[in-house]
Amino acid sequence: MAGLSIIFMGTPDFACPTLTRLIERGEDVIAVVTQPDRPKGRGQKLVPPPVKVIAEEHGIPVLQPQKVRAPEVVAQIRELNPDLIVVVAFGQILPQSLLEIPRHGCINIHASLLPRYRGAAPINWCLINGETETGITTMQMDAGLDTGDMLVKRSISIGPDEDAQSLHDRLSLLGAETIDETLDRLQVGTLTREKQDDALTCYAPMLKKEDGLIDWKQEPQQIKNLVRGFTPWPGAYTTLDGKTLKLYKVSVATECGKPGDIMAVGKDGIIVGCGSGSLRIEELQLEGRKRLSAQDFLAGCRLEPGIRLGH
């Protein structure tokens, strides 16, 4: 069967395995729509989105509109007349006028088991909330926020120490596998739609840096889940002598002490009281310094029992 003519819309690393899979399948990817190049680093040099790099390597035309809902952009996409638009972490909301263009509509790859965790940061919030399972849902897009009919779901278990980076990487690969199954079913006419039950939904809003502030009165597992969900960005944090201290890896310890008080230090980590127990800090970063193991951190920063973290 001849490949579908597809416009791919996506921007970050998460979207790359799916674009690569579409190319490998022999689908006719007629254009890639992505965000504009952004200035990065100290020199503020313009850096292309990862998806653009892959598209250019394969000679696929790239569109980078400031606003995809602009009438001239919609007209440009309509002129391309795609069979299907595949959307993965694009970063802009698509207008109804664009959703109606392809004969097979627009299919989105969403990094949760819908209807749970609609929104911009499902990977982070499922970790923060202590979920043990998540996955990928392909969805027939409508004008709402992740409210379209579900097509294919694939689930995976979440490791007890897994952070947002490792879960992101696994789900990005699972997304490519899920689009495989979705397109296979579409092309043989066995793709079915399932309505979302709005009563079962919860939301995963974009992370704000201030949401990562650690409350040492919370229970150890709650704080550990916050750290997992905020690693590597934007980082769960506390303060030490007025400086921001980001925590990247922690484990639940057995000691009990006052919330925020350092109870013990050693090569295995820094034990801090919290809730009705304690946490062991294993990787951390003080403002202005590199991310280090607790052992390396202690070699350059003297900490003693009784010092308090946070306000």
Swiss-Prot record:
EC numbers, comma separated: 2.1.2.9
Coiled-coil stretches are none
Listed A to Z, the keywords are: Protein biosynthesis, Transferase
Q: What is one GO cellular-component annotation here?
A: cytosol
Residue positions annotated to bind (6S)-5,6,7,8-tetrahydrofolate are: 112-115
What does it catalyze? L-methionyl-tRNA(fMet) + (6R)-10-formyltetrahydrofolate = N-formyl-L-methionyl-tRNA(fMet) + (6S)-5,6,7,8-tetrahydrofolate + H(+)
Can you name one GO molecular function term for this protein? Answer: methionyl-tRNA formyltransferase activity
Record function comment: Attaches a formyl group to the free amino group of methionyl-tRNA(fMet). The formyl group appears to play a dual role in the initiator identity of N-formylmethionyl-tRNA by promoting its recognition by IF2 and preventing the misappropriation of this tRNA by the elongation apparatus.
Entry similarity comment? Belongs to the Fmt family.
Please state what the protein is called: Methionyl-tRNA formyltransferase
The gene behind this protein is fmt
